[in-house]
Amino acid sequence: KNSNTENFQPIPLDSIKIKMKIGTKNHSLEFGISNNLFKKLKGISEKSSKFLLSKNNSIRETSKNILIIEFNPIKYQSFFERMPDSNLNFLMYNRRRPAIWNLQSYDLIKKSGCLIQTKNSLSDSNLSKIISNGKSQFEAKISDLFSKESFFESFFSIEGISFWPTFKEYFQEYFKKRAFEFIEEVELTKKLMKKYDFSSILILSEVGPNERIILQLAQEEQIPVCLVQHGINYDTKESYGMNVAKGVLPIESDHFLCWGKTGEEFSRSMSINPEKIHSIGSPIFDRLTFDEQNSLKNDCVLLVTSGPTKEHALDLTIEIIEKYMNAITKVCQLVTKYNKKLIIKTHPSPDELDPSFIAKQINSQIKVIKEGNISPLIQSCDLMIVIGFTSPIVDAHVLKKPVISLTALDNDWGIPTALKNESCLITDIDGLEDNLNSVLNNEHIKNELIQNGIKSSNEYLSHQSNGAAKLIGFLEELVK
């Protein structure tokens, strides 16, 4: 093989897809950059942010410190807006996402008084030496590990035929690179924990690499960790393994701050300690209110997609992908037939299938939006159609919009509450036309869906419009 070619082989998770909104008409551009370039750009922005947020570089010595991990300040806007009124100090540590990336996020953090911790703010010559020594020690262990050639040849084999030699060098390079990255992350987090005395820590998932590090160090220091529910979850017995794999259940966290009664009851049914579970609502819905004036502009159908994922093996089959594409095609055809405008809002995941090529073949006027807040789109639509089980269902119910759930993806996770409490009209592709016609032209059916949706949102979401206050109130009580 050509060694120059081998050097350019991509390593998993070594590149990042970035979606960027262009202009004011929701046009978006997607491009990929290497992980190394992303880290360099993130480092530059963090150094600039430190200068621009000089007033945020001090904390009140008499107040308790709360560490928040990988939070999006725009999504949690009401939470950040309430921080100045609290008697707590908030510090944010984002290693995968930038804390600041536009004027809105900068303004929110500046006004919140939240202290941003970065690699730059934690690094010094002593830490660099510790990391370097750790890598040297681990490199020797890696060499010893991979010297056991017979084990790897046997492990990576099928019916006695080993395929270890075909990817040996690639695997070793990948393993070493990731190990060195984790050594750095562990030491940075240790430095952060020594630098500040934290009374509690907020995380959004238990499975992220930095969250795993935080959970272990927090347990050693006996610092309570709160897992904050950040999206709608399957609440079925069949989905337990999937939910654990996604890190959305409090397996290791000390507290679970769930949205409402539905999440609370599901957690109890999964034998999670009731003392861990706290129904406090969610700051991400605080600014979501029904606007009757704008709601009268109902001039479109909104299709919300949550397509096949790389994490679920069944989603990778040709059959499932074709079924998903056929569902989008059918929606585009029917909405065009009824002379309604159609907007497609995709899931924000970088790996989400872009349906633009499908939509434009049917109707060039169909808009596909990949970035931005979905609430204004829901507010101005006459009807929302969802493919998959996704959080905008709750948004639509709060905003009093009828929802059709189009079954296009097969899984073994059971049927969640929102898809069996009559708050959504459930249909397959064959029944979509009749159901779409019913909701668009039958006010009784439409209003019944809206009323059932309101009831469902009250079960899913407690303390509506007051989630941030409840979250901060819980933290103040926890650490006092």
Task: Name the predicted role of every residue range.
Residues 1-480:
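Catalytic-core helical/loop segments in enzymes performing group transfer/polymerization on anionic/lipid-linked
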